Amino acid sequence: MSSWDNLLEGKVALVTGGSRGLGRADALALADAGADVVIADIMVESDQTPTRTEQESMLAQMMKAQGVVYTEQTVEDIRKMGRRSMAIKMDVTDRQGVFDGVARAAKEMGRIDILVNNAGTVDHVARFEKQSIELWERDLRVNLTGSFNCAQAVWGGMKERGWGRIVNLASVAGIMGGFGQASYSTTKIGVIGLTRTLALEGARYNITSNAVVPGIIGSEAFKMADALNKEMNDRMRKRTAFGREGEPEDIANAIVFLCSDKARYITGVALNVSGGIELFTF
């Protein structure tokens, strides 16, 4: 991992969904840039997690079998860099739980300067006419309301201190649409709208708000999908200008930049980190 020369020295970041995939890459990159990092995730394996649903337990076992790194390992890796880190269990759809978790993290770490809204869900594909209202509402709660909850929870502290950075994870599906992804695409364009509103309202308090817009990224989930349907993934690769997927570090590097003072005059931007997939016309 390349050094960012302590661009974020002295800052405290909170990354939702930070235990694996893009969230883990984001957390490690922020730490590499000098930040202390709080990992907020629904899948936390420790005495901080007194209960777990049957579904969560099944998912944990499945992902563990695939060699997925968990929250505690990410926290340990950050501490090895000489940064402070802690893990908190957080369901971003649980509004009170989000506020309680942020308050606890701020108390233990001193404050929250940076929020990366990475937590999200995209685990089903259904044509619009077959889309269930239950899955539609779940995607809205996780991807859009979850980002809203977390941003509100950190907003007061950022406003009081006169400095803050919010980065929301959107998707090219929000810009281009996605076949069989009515709910997911809708939530991701909604995230961009939320991002721009926060930018307008936050500027007077020196709070910037930006979105990073990934295309196809070689995350753990993408690699698992490769094993199931490589032909489909190859078609997606060919739609990018580079003919390949990006890496989680490509997203993480963009986030570090947007959180740094080098991007202090950038706000309300939806930054495509997509390999040019949105340029594909035929």
Put a short name on every predicted segment:
Residues 171:
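Residue(s) in the substrate-gating loop at a strand-loop-helix junction
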Residues 2-4, 125, 176, 256, ...:
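Short C-terminal tail/terminal secondary-structure segment
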Residues 1-109, 123-126, 134-135:
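Short-chain dehydrogenase/reductase
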Residues 240-251, 262:
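A conserved structural motif in NAD(P)-dependent oxidoreductases
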Residues 156, 200-204, 264:
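Alpha-helical segment proximal to the catalytic Tyr-Lys
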